[in-house]
Each structure stands twice: as structure tokens, then as C-alpha cells.
């Protein structure tokens, strides 16, 4: 895209910062705080917020690689409260979609989920194992993605899944299937 920092440009920024752009969550936090609206793209207008967005380490400073490096740790999502983390988690889905698609490919979700959710879920490892059993062309929609976060915050770990009620739940079917998968493993 013309006038847009794409995944390739973000990868280059990662190299310049000495980080792995494909696994450093702080890069996603940066894009989220810049207000990136298009999947895989930070516009020039959004990028210009580096010098003015109060939640960024470069606010009111000359925007240089050094100022960004110096404040990089402030972009750690571990500092986000749950009320801020939810919009960030949803952003991770939206930003990593391809174009106008309303879903993530299975392999994208497998790579992205552990980066985005980090240690906020006791279910991540088993959920990733579950997703790997799905066909390669399996897709995850936004409701399933966001519901996994809610599930993670509200349902206890396997094998008990305290807080889970299969008869009364309104979780997406994918999460019902996940619980069945996890219970069969025990």
C-alpha cells in the first residue's frame, strides 16, 4: 500500500530495534497505540502519532530509533489491565487479517495467539494443540478469537474447567469442541 508501513516495514523496524518482529508483542502494542485501522498497515497519519500519542515512549520527544529503543519496555502488554487488554487482543485479530477477510487462517492463529495472549491464559497450550488437529484450511473468526480470551479469563484450567457449563454456555461451538478435546486428553 502506498503511504503505508506494512508487515515488511514493521519487520525492518524490528531489525533496526534488534527485536524479532514476528514474535515481539510490543510491536503489536505500538501499532495498536498508533490506532492502525487497516490490516497489516500503519498509515502515514497513524505513524505521525509517534511524537504526540501520550501512551507512547516517544511522546513530546524527537522520534528517533534511540528514543523508541529507550522506551520499548513501556510497550509491554503485561502492563495492560484487562479492560485495556481486551481491545488490544481484538486489535491483534483485526490487524493480522488479510485484506477484507473476516477470519484468520489456522496457521496465522497458531502463530499469533501465543504472542498476543502471552501468559494470560492457562488454556493456550492445549488450545493450540486442539487447533493443530483442525484441517489446514480451518479459519477462526473474530467471535471465536475474542471468546477464547473471555473463556481464558472466566473458566478454570483442565481437567475441571471450573465455571464451564456445557448446557448453559453460550460459547462458540469451537470452544465446546475444545473442552471435549481437552477432557479426552486426561
Task: Go through each PLM region and give its residues.
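EF-hand-based Ca2+ sensing modules
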Residues: 13-43, 53-85, 112-136, 152-171
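Eukaryotic acidic, Ser/Thr-rich intrinsically disordered low-complexity regions
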Residues: 141-186
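Acidic Ca2+-chelating loop motifs
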Residues: 1-11, 34-54, 61, 98-109, ...
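Residues that form generic nucleotide/phosphate-binding pockets
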Residues: 92, 130, 148
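Surface-exposed interaction/gating patches
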Residues: 81-119
